[in-house]
Each structure stands twice: as structure tokens, then as C-alpha cells.
A protein has these predicted regions:
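Beta-strand-rich cores of mature extracytoplasmic or soluble domains
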Residues: 40-95
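N-terminal secretory signal peptides
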Residues: 1-46
């Protein structure tokens, strides 16, 4: 399924999440797609931010994500999913 979402790396604890905008639901990339999503985030890091310990945590990636859940939906829980692609990428700094 394709969702409009925001990908963010939480630098303090290393959680990588894709929030499905307009919902209270988050996806976590599974092992097969974690590196792929990290590369998308890192592609949006400005040179001036690359000196931070976790530069990918300084930005948000908005876009249309193709996600394929690998576990059943459970209300209130993060759902692991294979993330196949993102279209219409837009990077925004974390406020």
C-alpha cells in the first residue's frame, strides 16, 4: 500500500519510524529495508549538518511511501513493514 508519510530517525535511541500522516500509526522498516530508508534520509542531509553525531536525525523526509506490513496491525503499536520505495520526496529540517 502507498501512504503519505514522514520518515524520521530518532537520534537518541536510534528508532527509525515512518509516520502515516493523518493517523496515529507508525511503521518501522524491517531488516530488508532499514538501510534503504536510511540512505534516503542521508541523501537529504546538508553538508553543514554532516558533522553531527547522527546527521540523519536532523531532517524529516516527507513523501509517498510504498509499505508492505510484515506483521499484523495492532492498534497503538508500531508495525514493522518492508519499505519498497518513496516518491515525491521533500526534506525538511527538524524544528
Amino acid at each position: 500500500m502507498t501512504i503519505h508519510g514522514r520518515a524520521h530517525l530518532y537520534g537518541g535511541d536510534g528508532q527509525l519510524r515512518i509516520w502515516h500522516i493523518g493517523t496515529h500509526h507508525d511503521y518501522e522498516p524491517d531488516g530488508s529495508s532499514w538501510d534503504r530508508v536510511m540512505k534516503w534520509l542521508e541523501a537529504g542531509v546538508k553538508d553543514s549538518d554532516k558533522h553531527y553525531a547522527s546527521p540523519a536525525s536532523m531532517i524529516n523526509l516527507f513523501g509517498d511511501f510504498r509499505v508492505c506490513p510484515v506483521e499484523p496491525f495492532k492498534k497503538g503499536s508500531v508495525q514493522r513493514a518492508r519499505v519498497e520505495r518513496v516518491e515525491h520526496r521533500h526534506y525538511a529540517p527538524v524544528d
